[in-house]
Amino acid sequence: MRLRNVKGSRETIADNKYVVHNEESMKGKWSEFFGNTNPIHIEIGMGKGQFIMELARQNPDINYLGIEKYSSVLVHAIEKREQEEGMTNLYFIRMDAEYIENVFAENEVANIYLNFSDPWPKDRHAKRRLTSTHFFEHYDHILAPDGRVMFKTDNRPLFDFSLEQVPEAGWTLENYTYDLHHSEYNEGNIMTEYEAKFSALGTPINRLVAYRTKK
């Protein structure tokens, strides 16, 4: 799907106080950035930000970083963030997830959220999927020993692919469901904009939680 360009989005991001512009220099120093030692949770491909905004509201003792590579999408999250002046535990980064190890040190991230990621349907692009073994290797380097990767999607082929990739990457499935909203795991679920739209149409939402243990 081609994203609609938002005029002035790059300029808005460049001047915004809620966007971290020197993210690579913060590697290993995110606790200093937030001014506390609270756990750090990240959402990769956060879209318009509804999910991570609500997480930050509900959990003031957790620090959140929303990662989005498209300026035209990130500006919508910024608009929401600017309505929450009193919130001190949420910032954004505009970057490609491929370079995630340049931004976070070993064990620096407590949890990773992946919501409705690009399915990259062509086989030759499988490595680009955020639940490929390639990306799980990246997550392995930045995630704390007891950390989790939580993934939601309405795309069944992508979900089936992900279920195969987790053990192949040396990780373990803690739980998974093909219909989150009618499962025991739905309690406390926060919906993204996309999730709310398609769930209302009757589309089942798949979710998995994966973990690994540092050797």
Q: What are the residue ranges of the model-derived segments?
A:
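S-adenosyl-L-methionine
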Residues: 1-40, 50-57, 79-106
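Class I SAM-dependent methyltransferase "Motif I" SAM/SAH-binding loop
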Residues: 44-48
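A short acidic, Gly/Pro-enriched loop at the edge of an enzyme's catalytic core
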Residues: 102-111, 116
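A short glycine-rich, Lys/Arg-flanked "PGG" loop and its adjoining helix->strand segment in the class I
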Residues: 131-145
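Class I S-adenosyl-L-methionine
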Residues: 164, 169-215
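Conserved beta-strand signature within the Rossmann-like core of class I S-adenosyl-L-methionine
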Residues: 146-153
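Conserved SAM/SAH-binding beta-strand->alpha-helix loop
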Residues: 70
